[in-house]
């Protein structure tokens, strides 16, 4: 469906001085099929009550234009991550002010930093490992979430959430390439 009205409401609520210029939908059908298969055939069987915890979340692409990031064969790829409080991964926010206000949104050249773009992606986050406010050398070195169930089978958490701004951190497979580029002034 059309996400523009929802995005506009989220931007207006969290960034009252910003104005949504446009929402540009980008869909890679192959990556979307992979995402839907992961969500419907794999993740659904390991989540409590089958809840894959699917959400629309914002992602900043920093110095790289959103179009360039989405042109990659794997879509959002955690291997391009510079790391963060919870290691290398795709950092996703419920609130667009987190990537816009930080150094995460892509600043459009020639606009003096007043025009930015970021992504809004559909992500199936599955079972989250809640980190609270815990940040340490150990959390920064994380390569994957911790073990959730010793099993058998042994199950890991599917994503991590924590820190002062409460982003979600995922490993990549759960991010569908049903993304939209959000242009904000």
Feature roles, as predicted:
Residues 1-185:
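ADP-ribose/nucleotidyl-moiety interaction motifs
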């Amino acid at each position: 469906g059309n996400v523009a009205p929802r995005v506009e409401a989220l931007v207006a609520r969290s960034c009252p001085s910003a104005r949504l210029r446009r929402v540009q939908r980008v869909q890679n059908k192959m990556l979307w099929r992979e995402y839907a298969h992961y969500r419907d055939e794999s993740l659904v069987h390991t989540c409590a009550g089958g809840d894959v915890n699917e959400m629309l979340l914002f992602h900043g692409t920093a110095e790289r234009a959103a179009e360039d990031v989405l042109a990659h064969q794997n879509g959002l790829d955690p291997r391009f991550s510079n790391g963060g409080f919870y290691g290398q991964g795709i950092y996703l926010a419920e609130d667009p002010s987190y990537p816009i206000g930080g150094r995460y949104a892509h600043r459009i050249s020639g606009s003096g930093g007043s025009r930015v773009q970021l992504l809004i992606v559909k992500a199936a986050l599955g079972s989250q490992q809640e980190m609270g406010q815990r940040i340490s050398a150990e959390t920064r070195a994380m390569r994957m979430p911790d073990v959730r169930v010793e099993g058998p089978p042994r199950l890991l958490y599917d994503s991590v959430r924590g820190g002062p701004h409460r982003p979600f951190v995922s490993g990549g497979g759960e991010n569908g390439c049903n993304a939209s580029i959000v242009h904000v002034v």
